[in-house]
Amino acid sequence: MANLGCWMLVLFVATWSDLGLCKKRPKPGGWNTGGSRYPGQGSPGGNLYPPQGGGWGQPHGGGWGQPHGGGWGQPHGGSWGQPHGGGWGQGGGTHNQWNKPSKPKTSMKHVAGAAAAGAVVGGLGGYMLGSAMSRPLIHFGNDYEDRYYRENMYRYPNQVYYRPVDQYSNQNNFVHDCVNITIKQHTVTTTTKGENFTETDVKMMERVVEQMCITQYERESQAYYQRGSSMVLFSSPPVILLISFLIFLIVG
């Protein structure tokens, strides 16, 4: 809190100094006038610039022979043959314009990425789908199973289903629930595609998913702790009072 108070004091002094400088800034203008560098009236010896920004023979800022700022032969600022500023062959509307940009299409990769970053999965009672992970390298104690795992690891899940960590009393309960729901969902989804799992597959999936669920628990616990720390910090009365005072100075 001492370091926080020092930083808040520095922020207060910087804000107060900036407000003082804003009040002392001179008004914009030209040299020794306080106004425009090329005034439209009152210039000694006449004004070399037209008062309304037009060229030769332009009463209202348009091109040659333009009464109101349009192109050649344009009465009101449109393109050639346009009476009121529209596109080619248009009377001022914005429909059917040439080279009109099309609306960007939503990429399926973006949709999949959003669903894989902890989104709630519908139909699973509040379970969320974690982000994709690299399958861990696990040794099962014999050469056959180690080789079998290396050859079939791509068939096993690389994402886990889980509930928020604040709904569990400890890590073991979180991991147990995470393993069960993940294997169940992966088995059902894969079986409907015509692929079956042997007992060896299930055994290996349990080991793989368990490691992934432990990793997911550590990530979620860290994020939950950081959110809680931020809430405690900004809910303390001194910090709230100081922030309110700074907002009052800036807005006022």
Curated annotation (Swiss-Prot):
Cu(2+) 2 binds at residues 68-70. A lipid is attached at residue 229 (GPI-anchor amidated serine). GO terms for biological process: protein homooligomerization. Residues 230-252 form a propeptide. Sequence repeats lie at residues 51-58, 59-66, 67-74, 75-82, 83-90. InterPro entries: Prion, Prion/Doppel_b-ribbon_dom_sf, Prion/Doppel_prot_b-ribbon_dom, Prion_copper_b_octapeptide, Prion_N. One of its GO terms (cellular component) is side of membrane. Its main location: membrane. Glycans are attached at residues 180, 196. One of its GO terms (molecular function) is copper ion binding. Cu(2+) 3 binds at residues 76-78. Residues 23-38 are annotated as: Interaction with ADGRG6. Cu(2+) 4 binds at residues 84-86. Disulfide bonds join 178-213. SMART domains: PRP (SM00157). Residues 26-106 are annotated as: Disordered. It is found in: Cell membrane; Golgi apparatus. Residues 51-90 are annotated as: 5 X 8 AA tandem repeats of P-H-G-G-G-W-G-Q. Monomer and homodimer. Has a tendency to aggregate into amyloid fibrils containing a cross-beta spine, formed by a steric zipper of superposed beta-strands. Soluble oligomers may represent an intermediate stage on the path to fibril formation. Copper binding may promote oligomerization. Interacts with GRB2, APP, ERI3/PRNPIP and SYN1. Mislocalized cytosolically exposed PrP interacts with MGRN1; this interaction alters MGRN1 subcellular location and causes lysosomal enlargement. Interacts with APP. Interacts with KIAA1191. Interacts with ADGRG6. Belongs to the prion family. It is linked to PrP is found in high quantity in the brain of humans and animals infected with the degenerative neurological diseases kuru, Creutzfeldt-Jakob disease (CJD), Gerstmann-Straussler syndrome (GSS), scrapie, bovine spongiform encephalopathy (BSE), transmissible mink encephalopathy (TME), etc. Its primary physiological function is unclear. May play a role in neuronal development and synaptic plasticity. May be required for neuronal myelin sheath maintenance. May promote myelin homeostasis through acting as an agonist for ADGRG6 receptor. May play a role in iron uptake and iron homeostasis. Soluble oligomers are toxic to cultured neuroblastoma cells and induce apoptosis (in vitro). Association with GPC1 (via its heparan sulfate chains) targets PRNP to lipid rafts. Also provides Cu(2+) or Zn(2+) for the ascorbate-mediated GPC1 deaminase degradation of its heparan sulfate side chains. The normal, monomeric form has a mainly alpha-helical structure. The disease-associated, protease-resistant form forms amyloid fibrils containing a cross-beta spine, formed by a steric zipper of superposed beta-strands. Disease mutations may favor intermolecular contacts via short beta strands, and may thereby trigger oligomerization. Contains an N-terminal region composed of octamer repeats. At low copper concentrations, the sidechains of His residues from three or four repeats contribute to the binding of a single copper ion. Alternatively, a copper ion can be bound by interaction with the sidechain and backbone amide nitrogen of a single His residue. The observed copper binding stoichiometry suggests that two repeat regions cooperate to stabilize the binding of a single copper ion. At higher copper concentrations, each octamer can bind one copper ion by interactions with the His sidechain and Gly backbone atoms. This is Major prion protein. It comes from Sapajus apella (Brown-capped capuchin).
